[in-house]
From Swiss-Prot:
Residues 1-20, 29-237, 715-742, 893-922, 944-1085, 1116-1174 are annotated as: Disordered. Disruption phenotype: Larval lethal between first and second instar with reduced larval size. Conditional RNAi-mediated knock-down in proliferating cells of the eye and antenna imaginal discs is viable but results in small eye size and disorganized ommatidia, possibly due to excessive apoptosis. Conditional RNAi-mediated knock-down in cells of the prothoracic gland impedes pupation, probably due to reduced ecdysone hormone levels. Conditional RNAi-mediated knock-down in fat body cells delays larval development, induces dyslipidemia, and is lethal between late third instar and pupal stages. Residues 1156-1166 have a biased composition (Low complexity). It is found in: Nucleus, Nucleolus. This is Nucleolar complex protein 1. Belongs to the CBF/MAK21 family. It comes from Drosophila melanogaster (Fruit fly). GO terms for cellular component: Noc1p-Noc2p complex; nucleolus; nucleus.
Length: 1174
């Protein structure tokens, strides 16, 4: 049987023809490519196929004239388009015409049909209604057909498959072969081909029910697999607590039986183990390396590696999280770093911010709902159970982490406590999980013995309360437990109260009411103990001031926060307690008057009396600022004009004797009050309404002449009324006066009712000692204090007083208590540039900004930049001082230059006239004054100063004696050398002569601060001399301390034994003090003083002391020499040399030993050149 050749062409890809040759038995033979078998002949008896040939079948079914393709399967050049085979009615191949793309000429191409004998059989053409080409290519032309072969090489099934995509509007047809080898035409629906396990094809009909079910199952499995993959991708992108937001479904906790809890726990655990493989697939590519780094390397690297693992895949790395928590123990040196890393991990990855973590046994309601939900697949339910198990394990791990943090807080060092406090505060502010445990930890740290730790806990607790105002009630309840513990310390109570006062403004009314009750309870406890002058009382009053604004009174208190007994106690504190406590109490009373509309008379009377307290001049700037704020606010809200004028008068009186900064503050307060309340200006400015309330009725008409003309009309009515009721009953007159007089609670100036003449207090004149400001009569007094303040010694006070008198505006916006205080004034002489605030510091709250206050304007500029134009009145003193120093420096420089000119002129013979002319111009010809200037300005000006030197380059520190420190160091060096030289000398006379203890001649500034004793005077009886200056008593070492057995320790020692006893019992003193004491009582110091002193006045002052020395040494042999002064015990020169050699050979010998210094271990202090008595 002739072989049939079929050609399959693949479109849409590279042009490649595949050739299949069938032998006589009908089997297909695969020919090798020519390129793979180059040894075969090129044509091998057949012609080269240049163009695919059509197969023609005869009547016997055999193909005629079939030419084979190229054996090497090489792509022919003309094989770009496949050729179709056309058969006639008799089954023979008909000569085919050229293929028309539009299919308009000739019938459509036919498909090849094979019979049972594997021979091609005639096939009818396609029906036009079934398949329309519309001038396009057929489906099987667009997509080539593949023929699959079984193991025996026979072609069994042909299915349409292609590696390339066809056009979307075309669909290829599948060919189905039956048992007879014929293909059944079915153009409406493509046929399915199913393959067995051995690869053989099996015919499947569409009507087979089993195949439809299997198809549905396979489709559903593929869909479920695809959906699961999508779900996994979505879960990996979300945080774990956002994957199933429906659970927990309710806040209700359903009680479960023990069996149900165990069943649910096992179910969740098994589900988690089943899903663990899926969870592990989410690990990053370097997960294995991170696992290695978690157990090897430094502590910080291990912590970071574990954090990366947990961050990338929390559900698959619970073991890594457990390992990290183990690193947080206090025994680990790097626990602080691990705690910080884990805190970030809990905050950013693991903890849900809006709910608590749930354990498995609390999932009863969710489990019940999940079992009833039929929309979820079993796989989804299993995953939900796995998440429940993970959350339960995470809750346990978090509790273990907090245990380690608590251990660091309780038993750790300071750095451990700091890191633990920061971690606990961050977690408490972020999530509600374990908030009670975290809050207890932080509140307990308020009682830490280290003040820094307690302050840090207070700060972080305040931040938590500000972020979560709703937590204030819980925080206050926990702080209350701390305050009322039995073993609580005063420091812990102070920090707890400071914390409560910081959160009081942000609390709600019920929280403020609770704070008020706590403070009042603690207030009673402290009053009973008598501890009212401490910091705790101040903290209580400060907390009450802030909390009482929003507090609500109790239902059974008649609308009052304070009981009568409590009010009396508080007012007693104003008069009896310390000035700081009294000021805090006044602030509390002002809050009650301003906010709760309490009776104001008693408060104003207490404040008015407190302004006379002499302790106000010694208070700090903080207390003074608080007091001025209270006074300003009290006067501002007071509607009683006469009372307000009395307070203004009292403030002016305080200004006269107060320090400059408090005086300036009082004047600023008065200035603001007078500008806001114009009726307070002048001696009388009371309004008619207020005067009627404060008016006092005088029954005696003779006293009415004391009133001024301004109030004549008002008091004429009083006069008429008094005349009408002159002869009336005194009791009735008293009743009328009660109605018209002031209702002040402290105004009790009434005579007895039986007295005929009833007279009230005369308020027509000013009474500075009146206890009630409303009746002090300040409206009738002139404010002559302002005239005195114009002559105040502080220039700023003068300016402020002048501006108040002229009713002009005071343009000052700084803090007078800081700018005009003594510390600021002295700091300006230090010539330091002011500190510059950073941007972060400038943006802080008002409390911190007040502590870092810097002066504004000219007061905040460097001293060198001051000019006469921008200098303020209080800085003018410094400016003039510097200008004076500059002028002196210029005079010294000019004088030095002129000296050189004078010297040159003297050499030329013009000596006299030039010198006289210079002296007349410079007006400085005193050599002593020049030496004084040289010594004052230091060595810089001794050598001369360049006249053209810029003023900005002047070193003011050197001008003020900056070389003193260098001179002192040189003096010390000289003294050490002299001490060493003295040790090597054998004779006292040589010792005196060879000693070079010359001091610097320019040390005059240092000498000004020294007493007479330090400049060379010998004071043998410093305590008995009543005429000594106070500075002598303050100098170190000026008082010699005697032993306990001495009757008079101030007397000078009369013998070496007494001196030794005194020195032995005296406490150890510094080198300077020992040196001073030696210089005062030792004869050697007198010799040094004689040699180094340049001030002869000090020598005359010590003449009496020197004469007493001569009298004491009158009986000594060899008198008239210096040895008689230094050798009072009459020791020989041999004895002195032996003692000196003995001391020099001892181990503890460090040079020349003077009086008061120990000679050796356990020995008594020895005097140089003195013999011990045996």
């Amino acid at each position: 049987m002739p072989a049939a050749v079929a050609t399959g062409v693949q479109f849409g890809g590279p042009p490649k023809n595949k050739k299949i040759v069938f032998d006589d038995s009908g089997e297909a033979v695969v020919k090798q490519n020519k390129k793979e078998h180059p040894q075969r002949p090129k044509f091998e008896g057949k012609e080269q196929v240049k163009k695919p040939q059509k197969i023609k079948f005869g009547e016997d079914g055999k193909a005629k004239g079939a030419k084979s393709f190229n054996k090497n399967h090489q792509k022919p050049d003309f094989a770009n388009k496949p050729q179709r085979i056309k058969f006639g009615d008799d089954g023979e191949q008909v000569a085919s015409k050229s293929f028309n793309q539009n299919h308009k000429n000739g019938p459509k191409p036919q498909k090849i049909k094979f019979g049972e004998d594997r021979e091609a059989v005639h096939q009818k053409p396609f029906n036009k209604n079934n398949h329309k080409h519309n001038g396009q290519k057929s489906d099987f032309a667009n997509k080539p057909q593949k023929i699959k072969f079984t193991d025996d090489g026979e072609d069994e099934v042909t299915a349409n498959s292609s590696n390339t995509k066809t056009e979307p509007t075309k669909k290829s047809q599948k060919i189905k072969f039956g048992d007879d080898g014929e293909s059944k035409e079915n153009f409406k629906k493509p046929q399915r081909i199913k393959f067995d396990e051995d690869g053989a094809g099996k015919n499947v009909s569409d009507s087979d029910g089993d195949s439809d079910e299997e198809l549905g199952d396979s489709i559903s499995k593929k869909h479920n697999k695809y959906q699961s993959k999508i779900d996994e991708d979505e879960e990996s992108q979300k945080k774990w607590y956002h994957v199933h937001p429906d659970y927990p479904s309710t806040d209700e906790v359903l009680d479960m039986k023990e069996n149900d809890q165990l069943e649910l726990y096992n179910l969740c655990k098994n589900s988690f183990e089943a899903e663990k493989i899926t969870f592990n697939k989410r690990n990053p590519s370097d997960a294995r390396w991170l696992q290695t780094a978690l157990h090897k390397g430094t502590a910080k690297d291990r912590a970071n590696a574990g954090a990366l693992l947990v961050t990338s895949n929390p559900l698959g790395n619970l073991e890594a999280l457990s390992t990290l928590i183990g690193f947080c123990k206090i025994s680990n040196k790097a626990s602080n770093d691990v705690i910080a890393v884990l805190t970030d991990l809990w905050q950013e990855v693991l903890l849900p911010p809006n709910r608590k973590l749930l354990a498995v046994h609390t999932r009863g309601a969710d489990w019940k709902k999940l079992k009833k939900d039929e929309n979820l697949r079993n796989e989804q339910k299993r995953r939900i159970y796995a998440y429940w198990h993970f959350e339960s394990e995470l809750k346990d791990q978090y509790h273990e982490f907090l245990k380690n943090v608590m251990q660091g807080l309780q038993t750790g060092q300071e750095h451990n406590k700091n890191s633990s406090i920061v971690s606990a505060a961050r977690l408490l502010a972020y999530a509600p999980e374990k908030e009670q445990l975290l809050l207890t930890m932080l509140v307990n740290k308020l009682g830490d013995p280290i003040a820094k730790i307690a302050s840090k806990a207070l700060h972080h607790l305040s931040e938590v309360a500000q972020k979560h105002p709703n937590m204030c009630g819980v925080i206050v309840a926990e702080a209350e437990k701390l305050l009322f513990r039995n073993n609580i310390s005063e420091r812990a109570q102070h920090f707890a109260l400071c914390f409560l006062s910081s959160i009081a403004p942000s609390g709600r009314p019920e929280v403020c009411t609770k704070l008020v009750n706590i403070c009042f309870a603690l207030f009673k406890v402290l009053v009973q103990k008598g501890a009212v002058n401490n910091r705790t009382m101040q903290a209580i009053l400060r907390c009450l001031q802030k909390a009482i604004v929003e507090a609500k009174p109790a239902k059974d208190s008649n609308g009052e926060l304070l009981t009568k007994e409590m009010q009396d106690t508080i007012y007693r504190l104003v008069h009896l307690a310390d000035i700081r406590v009294a000021v805090q109490t006044l602030g509390l009373l002002l809050q009650l008057v301003a906010v709760k509309t309490e009776k104001s008379d008693r408060f104003y009377n207490a404040l008015y009396v407190k302004l006379l307290d002499l302790n106000l001049i010694n208070v700090g700037s903080k207390t003074a600022a608080h007091l001025l704020h209270i006074v300003h606010r009290a006067i501002h809200i007071d509607n009683h004009v006469a009372r307000a004028q009395a307070f203004v008068k009292r403030l002016l009186q305080l200004t006269l004797y107060a320090p400059p900064h408090i005086a300036a503050g009082c004047l600023i307060v008065i200035h603001k009050l007078l500008r806001m309340r114009r009726e307070l200006i002048g001696g009388t400015g009371a309004s008619e309404e207020v005067e009627e309330g404060s008016k006092v009725v005088l029954p005696i008409s003779a006293d009415l002449d004391k009133f001024g003309s301004d109030d004549e009309e008002v008091y004429e009515d009083v006069k008429d009324e008094a005349d009408d009721t002159k002869d009336s009953n005194p009791l009735e007159e008293k009743a009328d006066n009660d109605v018209k007089s002031s209702a002040s609670s402290w105004h009790h100036a009434r005579v007895a009712a039986t007295e005929a003449k009833v007279r009230d207090i005369d308020s027509c004149k000013y009474d500075p000692y009146h206890r009630v400001p409303a009746f002090a009569g300040a409206a009738y007094a002139l404010r002559h204090e302002l005239l005195l303040l114009r002559q105040h010694y502080h220039p700023t006070v003068q300016v402020f007083a002048e501006q108040i008198l002229q009713q002009s505006r005071i343009d000052y916006y700084g803090d007078p208590l800081r700018d005009f205080g003594l510390p600021h004034f002295l700091e300006r002489f230090a010539f330091k540039n002011p500190k510059k605030l950073e941007a972060s510091q400038a943006a802080e709250n008002a409390t911190v900004a007040h502590k870092r206050y810097m002066a504004h304007g000219a007061r905040g500029r460097p001293v060198k930049s001051l000019t006469k134009a921008n200098c303020t009145e209080d800085e003018m003193f410094i400016f003039n001082f510097l200008e004076h120093k500059r002028r002196q420096a210029e005079i010294v420089a000019q004088n030095k230059k002129q000296k050189e000119i004078k010297k040159d002129a003297a050499e030329e013979g013009d000596d006299g006239e030039a010198g006289e002319e210079y002296l007349k111009e410079g007006e400085v010809d005193d050599d002593e004054f020049e030496a004084y200037l040289d010594g004052y300005f230091g060595k810089k000006f001794k050598e001369g100063v360049d006249e053209e030197q810029d003023e900005e380059e002047l070193n003011f520190l050197q001008e003020l004696g900056g070389e003193i420190k260098k001179d002192k160091s040189k003096d010390k060096k000289k003294k050490k050398q002299s001490d060493k030289a003295e040790d090597e000398m054998d004779d006292i006379d040589d010792d005196w002569g060879d000693d070079d203890l010359a001091e610097d001649e320019d040390d005059e500034i240092e000498g000004e601060d020294q007493s007479d004793d330090e400049t060379g005077s010998i004071d043998l009886q410093p305590l008995d001399d009543d005429d000594d200056d106070d500075d002598d008593d303050d100098d170190e070492g000026s008082i010699s301390e005697g032993g306990p057995g001495d009757s008079d320790s101030s007397d000078a020692p009369e013998s070496p034994d007494e001196e030794d006893d005194d020195d032995e019992d005296a406490p150890p003193r510094s080198k300077k003090s020992r040196k001073d004491s030696t210089d005062m009582v030792g004869g050697r110091s007198f010799a040094k003083t004689l040699k180094q002193s340049h001030d002869m006045s000090s020598l005359f002052a010590a003449a009496d002391d020197f004469s007493s020395l001569l009298e004491e040494t009158a009986k000594v042999k060899g008198q008239g020499t210096s040895n008689a002064v230094f050798n009072k015990d009459k020791s020989s020169d041999k004895q002195l040399k032996w003692e000196e050699n003995r001391r020099s050979n001892s181990k503890s010998y460090k040079g020349k030993k003077f009086a008061g210094k120990p000679a050796a271990k356990g020995g008594r202090p020895q005097k140089a050149g003195k013999k011990r008595k045996h």
